[in-house]
Structure formats: structure tokens, C-alpha cells
Amino acid sequence: MNPNQKIICISATGMTLSVVSLLIGIANLGLNIGLHYKVGDTPDANTPNVNETNSTTTIINNNTQNNFTNITNIIVSKNEERTFLNLTKPLCEVNSWHILSKDNAIRIGEDAHILVTREPYLSCDPQGCRMFALSQGTTLRGRHANGTIHDRSPFRALISWEMGQAPSPYNVRVECIGWSSTSCHDGISRMSICMSGPNNNASAVVWYGGRPVTEIPSWAGNILRTQESECVCHRGICPVVMTDGPANNRAATKIIYFKEGKIQKIEELAGNAQHIEECSCYGAVGMIKCICRDNWKGANRPVITIDSEMMTHTSKYLCSKVLTDTSRPNDPTNGDCDAPITGGSPDPGVKGFAFLDGENSWLGRTISKDSRSGYEMLKVPNAETDTRSEPTSHQVIINNQNWSGYSGAFIDYWANKECFNPCFYVELIRGRPKESSVLWTSNSIVALCGSRERLGSWSWHDGAEIIYFK
């Protein structure tokens, strides 16, 4: 065979093999397509059963090997249907208070990166409850902790974190930026409000669903401020109490009604209350009650009752002779529903709360009349309306050898109960001004909820040894 014949023979053989390979490839492709449609035509055999739920996402792994066909990771999403919170239930009967949470932030912060905070509170949503506070933008052991006794700075922010944990840079969520705040969930999404800026020209930014929606300028040029605990929503309307003006004279207080972060109505304070700050609010049977701080005159607390559906309110003073602000004079013979009861020194007031429910009424106050130390709960039937009402039950929360601070109300409105169970928190302030051996001012938190049982008292104080921070 000559060279040309060899070349022709080799070329023919190569072409034949190429054609055979092509035919095999086409046959393989056809076979796979046929098998694929065969699998698709038999859903009972190879399609996973998908269970739809009322929660967020169901992920089902069903690995089926059949003629090289692999089905895996089928994801079916079904949005949970949410509705606006409806405050139709009454308050639960309370005979004592059980522990809910204690974060031990100062104790943990002796040896961990824990944020400096103050003005803490708790607030719940359909998924559970979270702790909130105004961070100072530094940690207890950080050098910037020097000077955190001051309330207002550009470095503060409203943060939230899982209930029971201590706040660190690694577990908190920033809700908004500012040095005064409130936050609440309407059943569909969360509204958070932060005040920031200079004393003479502060402003509020209202966030809803994680986005800024509304801005509010100062109306009196004197430290625009708000509740420092949760607001409450009813059928989508979320009233918030804000004050602008002097802390020791008549100020301009407004009740602003929001829906989805947008202003629906603004009311000037009406009624007998003469000074309003730092209201602690809760809702039941369609109404919202806010128990506030009269920083100008009253050792008895102002009460604002809000009808959020009508978007109207009234104000008065807690009638009981059991005084609950700090500092305060001795309890008088009679209370006053319409005017402040003066007296007490040296501090003009502290944030506090009460649950006012006829015979089922409870008041919280520091044990000391003169300083923010100790904390007790007093059952005072008809405290809202009876000027001679007095305690019938008593429970120590913090003994008087330990510091307390602000306190406020909250309720898990989504708990599966026939009634709304009252809960409260106490801020446990440590550091300056009382403990000047450290440079910082911060707090831990303890929270308790109502019980129908009659439980014993115990002191839930902060427990950190300041000497360890030196």
C-alpha cells in the first residue's frame, strides 16, 4: 500500500469512529430526555410531598437516584399571615411576680466585651421578646467609657438583643440612632423612634419595618424626648408621648398617633397632669394607660389614658396615697387625683410604672424615698381612683442595700393566654455617680412577670463587684 492509500485509510477510519461517537452521544441524550419526562410523568413516585406550614419556610431534602436523575433541595415558602395587634383581653390576675430574665451585664463585662448602656427596656413581638437599651458606643473596659455618665452624645444608639443575653458588639441589632427612644410592634412590623441632635434643636426619626419613614423637628427647642420604654399599638395605631421643654417647669407634651410609622394625629396634652416625662405604657381591653414622671412638682405619678381608636386621651394623677416617685415625702393620709403632691429631695424624679386594674392594681417604687436604691412591688387595690387606697400585698424585688434605677412596663401581647400578663423590668445602675472609682455609668437588667401563685421574695440585684474593675 503506497503512502497516499495509507493516508486515505486512516482518514476513513477516523471519520467512521467520529460518526459512531456522535451517534452514541445522540442516543445518550435522547435516553436521558426520555427518562427525565418519564420521571416527571410519575409524581407519586419521585416528587416529594411538601408540607406547607404557617411559619416562614419549609426545606425538604429528597435525594432520589433513578437513571442518574437527582432531585434535591426543594424549597417552598409560605408567608405567615400577620394582622394588627388587637388589645381585646383584660390584664391577668396577679398575686406575685416571678423571674423572667436577668442579663448580668456588669458581672459579665468585667471579663468580656459588654456595651455601656442605660435607659433599658423590654419589648415583644410575635416571635418573642427582646431587650433594648441606649448604647454609649463603647464597652465597659474601653477607654471611651470615661464620661458615659452624660445622657446625650452623637455616639448613642437604640440597640436590641436576645432576651437574657448581655449586650455586646457581636449580638446586638441597631434599631435607630439617638439618645432617647421608644419602640413597639403593631403585629405586622416594628416601629422605633430615636431622638438625636443638640439640646436646642433635637429631632426624632421614626423607623418602621427597618426603614426611616417620618422625621419630627423640635417644637420647643429644649431637649425633645420620649418614653424610654415600649409604646403600645392597637389595631395599627401606635400612640407615643413626647415632651419638649423644661424639666423643672411647664413643658410642651404631645401625644402623637402613628400608623406604620406615619403621623395620623397630634394632640396637645389635655387634663390635669402638669408635667410629663418618660411614660411607661401598657394596653388592655381596648385602652392604653401610660404612667409617667412629673419631674417638676409631683411625687405622685401622672396617668394618661389613651383611646387609640378615637385618637383621644385624658390625664390625671394616680389617686392613691402610696407615692411612687423618687425622691418623695412620706406617704400622706390622702392622695390626690387632680394635682401633684410635692415634697422630697434631692432628686426630682425617676422613670416608673404601675398596672391599674381595680382590685388587681400594682405599683412599683424604690424602697428608699431619697435615692434610687432597692425596689418593691405593692398591691394597692383601686389605686387609680381611691385617694385612701393602701397596700394589701408586698414583694421585694431589689433589697435596699443595692442600687436600682429606671423601671417600666411591658407585656407579651402574643402569648397564648386568655389575658395579658403584666411584666416589668428594673434598671440596675452601676458606676458613676454613686460608684466613682470607675469611669463609666452603665446598667444590667432584671425582668419579672405576674403570677397567680403567691411566690416568695428574693433580691435580684446586679451583683457585680466594682473593685474587680479597678
From Swiss-Prot:
Q: Which residues bind Ca(2+)?
A: D294, G298, D325
Name any Gene Ontology BP term: carbohydrate metabolic process
Q: Does the keyword Transmembrane helix apply?
A: yes
Task: Map out region (Involved in apical transport and lipid raft association) in residue numbers.
Answer: 11-33
- Which residues are named in the active-site annotation? D151, Y406
Annotated binding of substrate, by residue = R118, R152, E277, E278, R293, R372
Where does it sit, as one GO cellular component term?
membrane
The cofactors required by this protein are: Ca(2+)
Give the protein's biological function: Catalyzes the removal of terminal sialic acid residues from viral and cellular glycoconjugates. Cleaves off the terminal sialic acids on the glycosylated HA during virus budding to facilitate virus release. Additionally helps virus spread through the circulation by further removing sialic acids from the cell surface. These cleavages prevent self-aggregation and ensure the efficient spread of the progeny virus from cell to cell. Otherwise, infection would be limited to one round of replication.
Membrane side Intravirion: residue ranges: 1-6
Q: What keywords would UniProt list here?
A: Calcium, Disulfide bond, Glycoprotein, Glycosidase, Host cell membrane, Host membrane, Hydrolase, Membrane, Metal-binding, Signal-anchor, Transmembrane, Transmembrane helix, Virion
- List residues traversing the bilayer: 7-27
Spell out the family assignment given in the record's similarity comment: Belongs to the glycosyl hydrolase 34 family.
The UniProt record lists the EC number as 3.2.1.18
Name-wise, this protein is Neuraminidase
Anything else known: The influenza A genome consist of 8 RNA segments. Genetic variation of hemagglutinin and/or neuraminidase genes results in the emergence of new influenza strains. The mechanism of variation can be the result of point mutations or the result of genetic reassortment between segments of two different strains.
> What are the disulphide bonds in this sequence?
C92-C419, C124-C129, C184-C231, C233-C238, C279-C292, C281-C290, C319-C337, C423-C449
Query: What does the UniProt entry state concerning the protein's domains?
Result: Intact N-terminus is essential for virion morphogenesis. Possesses two apical sorting signals, one in the ectodomain, which is likely to be a glycan, and the other in the transmembrane domain. The transmembrane domain also plays a role in lipid raft association.
* Sugar-bearing residue positions: N51, N54, N62, N67, N70, N86, N146, N201, N402
This protein's assembly is summarised as: Homotetramer.
**Location within or outside the cell:** Virion membrane; Host apical cell membrane
Reading the lineage from the top rank, the first entry is Viruses
Q: Where is this region: Head of neuraminidase?
A: 91-470
Q: Provide the species name.
A: Influenza A virus (strain A/Budgerigar/Hokkaido/1/1977 H4N6)
How would you describe the post-translational modification of this protein?
Answer: N-glycosylated.
Region (Hypervariable stalk region) location:
36-88
Question: What is the protein's major site of localization?
Answer: virion
